[in-house]
Design a protein with these regions (language model features):
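Short helix-loop capping/hinge motifs at secondary-structure junctions, enriched
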Residues: 103-106, 133-134
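Residues at the C-termini of beta-strands that transition into short coil/loop
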Residues: 66-69, 102, 114
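Hydrophobic alpha-helical positions that pack around
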Residues: 98
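Short, solvent-exposed helix-loop connector elements
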Residues: 79-80, 107-114
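Surface polyanion/phosphate-binding segment centered on an Asp-His-Pro turn
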Residues: 111-134
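A residue-level signal for beta-strand positions that form part of recognition/binding surfaces
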Residues: 62, 95, 107, 123
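Metal-dependent phosphoesterases centered on the DNase I-like endonuclease/exonuclease/phosphatase
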Residues: 2-90, 94
Length: 134
């Protein structure tokens, strides 16, 4: 985790805009996990893991694209490997698009569609109003 934070810090100094997409396996906030009270000592929601994500989206200034446009709960991207967990939506939001601050204003919409499923993870789809230049 520390190596990735160092990498993000190094990239930030390049003064370019970046979007980092992937599964961080950390539910940062209470609304990113269904049963947060029971999960405070579980991997993926441990205080040091959440503090690491807080540092990335706080002190380091990166932006969580989903939370930029939605503060709703029950938006999860991963469920334990059993049908009942998914049926009851006992999920975690482990998947992120983390942006450099300059891209914040371009986020228009974000969603985690549960179908179709290609793995245990739902895709995080973010719409940007941004013209890509090469």
């Amino acid at each position: 985790m520390d190596d990735f934070a160092k990498y993000l810090d190094k990239q930030r100094r390049k003064r370019r805009e970046y979007i980092y997409c992937g599964s961080f396996y950390v539910a940062q906030q209470k609304l990113d996990i269904k049963n947060w009270r029971d999960s405070q000592q579980s991997p993926g929601f441990l205080p040091p893991e959440r503090a690491w994500m807080d540092a990335i989206t706080g002190d380091m200034g990166y932006v969580d694209a989903l939370r930029e446009v939605s503060r709703e709960g029950d938006q999860y991207s991963w469920w334990p490997d059993n049908e009942q967990a998914e049926m009851l939506n006992l999920g975690y939001r482990f998947d992120y698009q983390i942006l450099t601050p300059g891209l914040r204003r371009f986020v228009r919409n974000a969603r985690l569609p549960r179908q179709p499923r290609f793995s245990q993870h739902a895709p995080l789809i973010v719409d940007y109003d941004w013209t890509l230049t090469i």
